[in-house]
Amino acid sequence: MDIEKFARVAHKAGVPLIVDNTFATPINCRPFDFGCDIVTHSTTKYMEGHASTVGGAIVDSGNFDWTQNDKFPGLTTPDDSYHGITYTEAFGKGAYITKAVVQLMRDLGAVQSPNEAFLLNVGLESLHLRIPRHCENAKKVAAYLKQHPAVTWVECAMLEGDRQYDLAQKYMPRGTCGVVSFGVKGGRAAATTFMDSLERHPGGRRSHLLPAPGIYHPSPADGRTVGGLRRAPGSGAPERRH
C-alpha cells in the first residue's frame, strides 16, 4: 500500500496509522520513515524464521499525539484497574505502548514463555541474512511461474510490470518478501492437487504454500480467488522440489 498516502488520510482524521510489517520485516521496509505511527509483526514468520514459536510484536514510534481529540478515552481518562492512572498524563506520547504492556498484556496474557523468547532472539540474529535470500528465491520462482503454461497469473511486486512494482520500489527497493501469489489452470481442484504435494506454512526457512480459500475462508465465496495459491519460497535452492 502507499504508506505516505494512508498516513496523510489517517492523520487528517486524527487517528494513527498502524502497519503490519510481518512479511517485509524491518530489513526491507521502514514504515516509520514514511509517516506510520505503529508497526506490528507476527514474529512467528520471518523474524523467528524456523516455525518453532508463536509470537507477535508492537513497535510504537512515539510520534502520535493521543490527546489531540477525544477518540482515545482508554488513554486520556483514568484507568481504574491500574491505580487510576491516566496514560497520556503519565507517559505522554508513550501512552499507547505503556497501556499495551501494563494493562492489555496483563488482562489477555499475551506473553511469550522464556524459551520461546530465547528462540525468537536466536532467529533474529540471522534475519539480515535470510531475508535477501528469501527475496532472491521468490523473484526467481515468480519469473519461472510467469512462463509456465499451467499458471494463469502471478503477483510478485519485485517483478517489473507487476501492478505493485512502483510502490515496492518506493518503499522496499531492496526487496519485498518471499511470498508469491499465483493461480493455476483448472481452478480449485487443480490448485488443491498441486497444493497437497507441498509443505504448507509461510515465513520459515523451508518453502511452503497456502491456498487462497484457506486464507480467506470467512470471506464471501465470490470474494475468494478460485484456484489461487500463495507460495513462500524458503532460503534453500529455489528450484528445490517437494
Outline where the language-model segments fall:
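Conserved PLP-enzyme active-site core in the AAT-like
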Residues: M1-Q147, E155
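Active-site beta-loop-alpha junctions enriched in small/polar residues
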Residues: T22-A24, L159, R241
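Residues at secondary-structure transition points
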Residues: G55, G62, L129, L210-P211, ...
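Short hydrophobic/aromatic beta-strand micro-patches
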Residues: V59, S181-G183, E239-R241
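Conserved C-terminal alpha-helix-loop-beta "cap" of PLP-dependent enzymes
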Residues: I131, K146, A150-G236
